[in-house]
Each structure stands twice: as C-alpha cells, then as structure tokens.
Amino acid sequence: MTDISNRPRTWWENGTVSASLLAVAVLAGSLASDKWVPNSQLTLPLLISTSVAALVAAAGIPRLKALKMGQVIRVEGPQAHQSKAGTPTMGGLLVVPVGTIVGGLISLEGTEAQQLLAVSAITLGYMVIGGFDDWRSLTRQTNTGLTPRGKLLLQSLMGVLFLAVAAWQGWISSSVSLPFGWTLPLGWLIWPLGLFVFLAESNATNLTDGLDGLASGCGALVFLGMAVQLMLRGHTGDPALAGFCMTMAGAWLGFLMHNRHPARAFMGDTGSLAMGAALSGVALLSDSLWPLLVMGGVFLAESLSVIIQVWVFKTTKGPDGQGRRVFRMAPLHHHFELGGTSERTVVPCFWLATAGFVLLGLLLRPTI
C-alpha cells in the first residue's frame, strides 16, 4: 500500500472545507428549486433542521463521551482506523429525531400528515433497532451487536408494519413509474419488493457509514435529490414529503459539522439504518423507487461490493479456506483506502459521485 502519511494535503482533503462546500451545494440546490419550481419551499425546512441538528449534536456529543459510548473498531479493518477507537458513536440518536420532528410539522392535517407520521415512525423505528445494535456492541466491547439474523428479523417486522398501514390506507401504487412515461406493473409483488427495499436500502446506508462524513454527506445529497424530484413530478409536486426529505437532509448536514474528518462522533447503526428507512419510506409512498435507485448509486455500489466479495470468495474457496477477492477489502470505500487513496480524498470523491447520480436521477425522473 502506498504511504500517504507525509504527502501534502490538497484543499479538498480539508474536512472543514469539503463539508462546507457540500453544505453550500445542498443549500444552492434548495434555493434553485424554490426559485424555479412551482410550490417549492425547500430552503426553510433545510435551514431550520440543519441549525437545530448542529446545536443538538454539539450539546449531545460531550454527553455521549461522558457515557463512554466509544466506537469499537473491527480488528480486520484498515489499520489506519484503529486511531478512531473511542470516538463517540450513536450520533444518529441526536439528529434523527430532529429531522423527523421538524419534518412532521410540515403538514398537520389530512393524508399528508398521516404519511409524514408513518415515515417518521419507520425512521424512528429503525433508529431504535440500530441503537439496540450499537448498545450491544458497546456493552460487549466488540464490533458486532445483534446477530445478522436478529437484526434482519427486527427490520423485517418494522417494514411489514409500515407496509400493512400503507396497504390499509391505499398509499402505495402497485406499479413503479419509470422514465419516458413507462411504468412497471407489479400487482401484489409490490409488497415483497417494498420489504426488500427497506432491508436493502437500510443495510446499504449502513455499509456506507465507514469513513468520516461519508454516509452523512451522501445522505444529505440523496435527500435533496429526492425532494427536488418530488416537486418536479405532476402539477403541484409533493410538498409534504419533499419538505420531510429536506429536514432529513438538514439533520445530516448539521451532524456533518461534527462528523467530518476528523470526526468528533459517528452516527452508528442508530443513524445509518434510520437514514435508509427514511429514504425507503418516502420512495414507496411517492412512487419514487426508480429515482432512489439511481440517486443512491453510491449506496448501491457499496452494497454490491460486499455481495460480490463474499460470493466470489465462497465460490473460489479452496481446501486451505482461502478464496479469491475482487476488492482489496469491502465495502468499496475500503478498497480505495487500501490502494493508497486517503480517507480525506475518498470521501469528497464519493460525494461528487453521489451528486452526479442525483443529477442523473433528476434527468431520468418519472414524468408522472
């Protein structure tokens, strides 16, 4: 591996600079939407949520330290990450409620209010699952909390509950809207697909949360993209769910002020699972599965890298127990790290990739 420790840093490798540029980009996107898209009011929820989340995180992180909520770093991970041991985790507990509470206040009556309540509930539910997982990791002083099967079961139960309420209310379309006026009719298959989306997206965002500011920055951009495409759809857009997306984007921007390199706190499973659940809930209620798939391209790549790595290793494993590896290490961000690219470079590059996927998702958004 290339030695990068003594190499001079470029300006984009400064965590404060790169995080500030990301925040400016998200703000510019919301301002542009408010100026040119009818009925768009994305900036105010963004600013309120960002400010409150940043303040709550600033007040809460010292408390996490006092409670000894220090992250346990996995031994088999990159050696450079061992210096992160002891950094407070469970940061999602500080900012996810901010996004859901501010988002829930956008509409207080009618179907919009009910949908906001449902999305907030599934987001907080996954936050609790992630929190339980983080807590078990901390109390056991290992990098693993819940068993994979146990975590999957809890995620599935929460997803089924959300889908049952949505089915009862008739909120979810049985077809998936695609670009160019195409639709994919699924009928009853939309329900197993919906559960798969919750499981896949929440675990993809969880896998992405491996470098300082990576998941929080990517999440803020994807929430912005989802909000803008919601306002561009139909005649009046979907101001309520779009506003919720912006409060979640703001929550992660506020957290990024403390999660940028060098991170003062990690979101933990508490935050990453909640992020994926919020995106999934919004996508299912607004028939935005296609935009989420495209805009979350980095999340998808991180998840696929793990699936490919495990599959190839198992299928090529010999008598000595060793198999081939496609990547130096999975998820994908570790592959670049072990190739000699610094964490400070990988993160803004993944942010730029996410911004590109968001723009592509806006260009290829469904028209209905």
UniProtKB/Swiss-Prot annotation:
UniProt keyword Cell wall biogenesis/degradation present: yes
EC number: 2.7.8.13
Membrane topology: Multi-pass membrane protein
Major localization class: membrane
Pathway assigned to this chain's UniProt record: Cell wall biogenesis; peptidoglycan biosynthesis
One Pfam family per UniProt: MraY_sig1
Catalytic reaction(s) noted: UDP-N-acetyl-alpha-D-muramoyl-L-alanyl-gamma-D-glutamyl-meso-2,6-diaminopimeloyl-D-alanyl-D-alanine + di-trans,octa-cis-undecaprenyl phosphate = di-trans,octa-cis-undecaprenyl diphospho-N-acetyl-alpha-D-muramoyl-L-alanyl-D-glutamyl-meso-2,6-diaminopimeloyl-D-alanyl-D-alanine + UMP
Lineage top rank: taxon: Bacteria
Membrane-traversing stretches: 11-31, 42-62, 88-108, 112-132, 152-172, 180-200, 211-231, 237-257, 265-285, 293-313, 346-366
Functional description taken from the UniProt entry: Catalyzes the initial step of the lipid cycle reactions in the biosynthesis of the cell wall peptidoglycan: transfers peptidoglycan precursor phospho-MurNAc-pentapeptide from UDP-MurNAc-pentapeptide onto the lipid carrier undecaprenyl phosphate, yielding undecaprenyl-pyrophosphoryl-MurNAc-pentapeptide, known as lipid I.
Name this protein carries in UniProt: Phospho-N-acetylmuramoyl-pentapeptide-transferase
Organism of origin: Parasynechococcus marenigrum (strain WH8102)
Lineage of source species: Bacteria, Bacillati, Cyanobacteriota, Cyanophyceae, Synechococcales
Gene: mraY
